[in-house]
Amino acid sequence: MDELQDVQLTEIKPLLNDKNGTRNFQDFDCQEHDIETPHGMVHVTIRGLPKGNRPVILTYHDIGLNHKSCFNTFFNFEDMQEITQHFAVCHVDAPGQQEAAPSFPTGYQYPTMDELAEMLPPVLTHLSMKSIIGIGVGAGAYILSRFALNHPELVEGLVLINIDPCAKGWIDWAASKLSGFTTNIVDIILAHHFGQEELQANLDLIQTYRLHIAQDINQENLQLFLGSYNGRRDLEIERPILGQNDNRLKTLKCSTLLVVGDNSPAVEAVVECNSRLDPINTTLLKMADCGGLPQVVQPGKLTEAFKYFLQGMGYIPSASMTRLARSRTHSTSSSIGSGESPFSRSVTSNQSDGTQESCESPDVLDRHQTMEVSC
């Protein structure tokens, strides 16, 4: 436990050691584009150049954030350079959420979540991108999932952090409407990102994001994006039934890594999403001692998981591996040797003592459970 605490404190520090708390929010060597789509203008930021026929890493942020506050701590993390040297990165900002965005005109109809997903194909076409590996958080994870369901040929893999695949129930909708009259939108967004324990214990991090949401994000535009997210439809994904080959079944066909911190308010939703996805190509990563923004609080662990995820897809095979990846490789070596996907076994990896525990019965090769990893 002491080791986990040391890692957590070390990785939070770079976010907070600047006087304004935004040091790792900065972009480096990027190009910005405003791209017109049938559903309006979208702002994108490109890091690096496309590498041959490799997919581009495309990110989509959550409500109350933009690509800088959601992803730059992660992509500026030192170990991520081993990945970004092999891939171009395309950060997408939802309409009106980018830094210094002007307010929309009165009466502007903000795109629905489905329409936000349909803004992505014109972006890829404009930038001559053939396919993506998506990384989405919260609302961004939902948008990328919808995009992958509608355009599976354009998506090679997805990393979905804090995803909620369900529509907002009418009781939740009514509660959010009532709370909107009595609660500041900043507090609503903070409660979306962080659980009560984190809100009370990690005061520096919470203050950093409170100021960012209140001062750096256009409040009128944020209200519109929040309304769009609250009005989302159910993704209507279904877990395939063993032995049944039904092309009409709606599910994510690409390799998928689900990520959630064990103290995140999104745990229940992510577990629900996991239960609906094909276990053959899905991995669920539960990050210990972690709250609602694992890419910010523990970028090292997430980088290692992402590196291993890319290796499983056949990319960057020479990348270095730390204990998390080595323990997972050891526990799946027999299945890989027999031609089985490393993502088709259920394994729990304990970083604190380097041990791993198989969750399958010894006499049955489990090919139909999602791999669940704790780190």
From Swiss-Prot:
Residues 364-375 have a biased composition (Basic and acidic residues). Expressed at high levels in brain, followed by small intestine and kidney (at protein level). Also expressed in thymus. The keyword Phosphoprotein applies. Keywords: Acetylation, Phosphoprotein. The modification Phosphothreonine is found at T322, T329, T332, T355. Residues 330-346 have a biased composition (Low complexity). GO terms for biological process: decidualization. Residues 326-375 are annotated as: Disordered. GO terms for cellular component: cytoplasm. The modification N-acetylmethionine is found at M1. The modification Phosphoserine is found at S331, S334, S335, S338, S341, S352, S361, S374. Residues 347-359 have a biased composition (Polar residues). Belongs to the NDRG family. This is Protein NDRG3. It comes from Mus musculus (Mouse). The lineage of its organism: Eukaryota, Metazoa, Chordata, Craniata, Vertebrata.
